[in-house]
């Protein structure tokens, strides 16, 4: 008799294991009771931050290897959070593969500490802040005929702030609409039509989204934006709206990367790091940039005058992460050998797809109402022109949690 394998779907959207007892229960009074253990949670959050950064660069390198002519944009926090949540229902080698593929060494960092870290990370990112719009959420859509393990539902709710929804996957169109509506609402309309088609054999869909909308501490003046050339490669040049500001910046030239490194703060706790390699040095930048270098850039402050040109853009990218994560060692969960019996014991389960969609918009908007003007003192000597008119990297980093929210490469700003 043939073994019947039912399907689970992992969906991740971005803008800008189990023991018989509940892991949340094990952590009760520690990670779950935030008022008594905030410091412990924060420490756990900072413990997983280097792993998240290393995971981000691992994903980046895999995507860059696939194509050097396409934009790259993804949220490592969204991907890691979703798979950490999935690990709560995985067992045996499936469970180990997921956590090790995310970059965690289980002999150095206990699993409970990993989930405490994600719990605090998600809690911190979702704190109301009128200065920036940053929201993240996890939704678990369960086929109405399926019976999920209670401890799994309890864990994903308490540790990963997940909501569970009953859904009829046999009505594929209606199920698709409900999932897409959930993501569109959570991302404030920025992520639409994440799911294009659904398999009727799907038993559950795990959905993660992250949406960020920030305001520059020092905005660009709209009237200074002009159309200029962006050199995609030696053969291709496109016209793009280029923002411009003359002033003081956290900007320096890194000899090791042969690149300009620019940090622009948003109001709140998020910093954007833009890295512009010299002509012909993009490969050198990609080969040498790592978590340690990024941490140094974020720690040390520079004050340099410059005439800055930065493209105004709106890009989005969609990935099926099955291949990329497979190269990082996460294979079993996508195969007939998956052990997800911590999610449901009724039937064998595997993940059929892991879709991730991320969108980035960069524009002039600042912290003040229209017409506000910033005046800065700059040296009398002529400042250098720093023009992001060729492929560059960008990393959005949350300073509170020390985590990379988004990582990307802009090859062509006109590529939607």
UniProtKB/Swiss-Prot annotation:
Which Pfam families does the entry mention?
Answer: Serpin
Q: Does the keyword Phosphoprotein apply?
A: yes
Enumerate the residues marked as the site Reactive bond.
380-381
UniProt-recorded Gene Ontology molecular function terms: serine-type endopeptidase inhibitor activity
* Region listing for RCL, in residue ranges: 371-390
**GO CC terms:** extracellular space
Swiss-Prot/TrEMBL domain comment: The reactive center loop (RCL) extends out from the body of the protein and directs binding to the target protease. The protease cleaves the serpin at the reactive site within the RCL, establishing a covalent linkage between the carboxyl group of the serpin reactive site and the serine hydroxyl of the protease. The resulting inactive serpin-protease complex is highly stable.
Q: What does this protein do?
A: Inhibits human leukocyte elastase, pig pancreatic elastase and bovine trypsin on a 1:1 molar basis.
Q: What is this protein called?
A: Alpha-1-antiproteinase
Which organism is this protein's natural source?
Ovis aries
